[in-house]
């Protein structure tokens, strides 16, 4: 792994695949590190010849941390409902600027911009605010932020908003595993042991719940992107699971409806996670999409 300054922020990142491969920037979700998804997912894309760049978002993992008081989430939500600008340490727009800045720091003019969950929200903003940097948009179990979309299930919502009883490793891992189960895929077995081991490694690498809280504030403070997404004119792939109870599949469908000519794939029984079995379904969709976009670009 390596570290660069992007948008004035120290960002930890990792590359897989050939340096001369088609660049794909992967943006992680709420509170998650670049190591939070199975390594096999990024490796599968790299094995297809892509230059895969993943990074720790600001305030998480080994990237630069923020300090200071945690935002009052109730006040942030009330400000948004009242049409006022909420007070938050940073916004999703700032995080999109980090992603664009990382490409600049690596000397990459443009890349396929992929993001999952909150990372999908950030990827949408990269495509909107830095269009020359986005060869395509790949939005994975994410949303437009439209307030009329169905909410998370009570169990999934609780998984995000409740805290473990203590911050020791065993308690944090058990709490996270229980939460992930609430929005896991129904199509494949829930591998508690493997997930617990992954969460434990991430705890050892960089446990920083304060950053997760600030990420949540940034999500709450983000205005809907519905109308802005209608202006996009780039290739877009939207992937969602029918069993996602955290960000409902209606959100994925709505994202695809807002982007002209977007491709939408709703995967039966897939939740808000990436079990090993899902990689064999999701990765080929991404590889095929990127190859078609690149072929069309060369033919133009």
Model-identified regions with their sequence ranges:
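Conserved HGGG/HGGXW glycine-rich cap/lid loop of the alpha/beta-hydrolase fold
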Residues: 9-82
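Conserved acidic catalytic loop of the alpha/beta-hydrolase fold
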Residues: 86-89, 93-111
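Flexible "cap/lid" loop of the alpha/beta hydrolase fold
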Residues: 128, 137-167
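Conserved alpha/beta-hydrolase catalytic His-Asp/Glu region
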Residues: 170-213
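Active-site nucleophile elbow and catalytic-triad environment of alpha/beta-hydrolase enzymes
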Residues: 212-228
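Short beta-strand/loop motif that positions the catalytic acidic residue
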Residues: 232, 238-240
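Acidic catalytic loop of the alpha/beta-hydrolase fold
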Residues: 243-247
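Catalytic active-site module of serine/aspartate enzymes centered on a nucleophile-bearing elbow/loop
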Residues: 262-300
């Amino acid at each position: 792994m390596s570290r660069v300054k992007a948008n004035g922020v120290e960002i930890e990142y990792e590359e897989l695949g050939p340096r001369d491969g088609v660049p794909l920037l992967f943006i992680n979700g709420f509170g998650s590190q670049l190591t939070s998804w199975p390594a096999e997912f990024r490796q599968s894309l790299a094995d297809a010849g892509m230059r895969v760049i993943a990074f720790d978002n600001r305030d998480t993992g080994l990237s630069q941390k923020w300090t200071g008081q945690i935002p009052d989430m109730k006040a942030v939500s009330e400000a948004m409902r009242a049409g006022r600008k909420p007070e938050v340490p940073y916004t999703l727009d700032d995080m999109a600027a980090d992603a664009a800045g990382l490409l600049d720091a690596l000397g990459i003019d443009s890349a396929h911009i992929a993001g999952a969950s909150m990372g999908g929200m950030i990827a949408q903003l990269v495509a909107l605010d830095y269009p020359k940097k986005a060869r395509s948009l790949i939005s994975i179990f994410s949303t437009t932020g439209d307030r009329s979309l169905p909410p998370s299930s009570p169990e999934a919502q609780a998984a995000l908003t409740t805290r473990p009883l203590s911050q020791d490793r065993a308690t944090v891992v058990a709490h996270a595993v229980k939460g992930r189960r609430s929005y896991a895929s129904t199509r494949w077995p829930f591998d508690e042991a493997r997930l617990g081991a992954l969460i434990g490694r991430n705890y050892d690498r960089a446990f920083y719940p304060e950053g997760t809280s600030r990420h949540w504030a940034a999500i709450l403070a983000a205005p809907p992107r519905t109308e802005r997404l209608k202006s996009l004119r780039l290739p877009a792939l939207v992937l969602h699971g029918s069993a996602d109870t955290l960000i409902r599949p209606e959100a994925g469908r709505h994202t695809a409806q807002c982007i002209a000519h977007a491709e939408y794939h709703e995967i039966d029984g897939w939740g808000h996670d990436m079990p090993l079995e899902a990689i064999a379904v999701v990765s080929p969709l991404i590889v095929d999409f990127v190859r078609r976009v690149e072929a069309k670009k060369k033919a133009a």
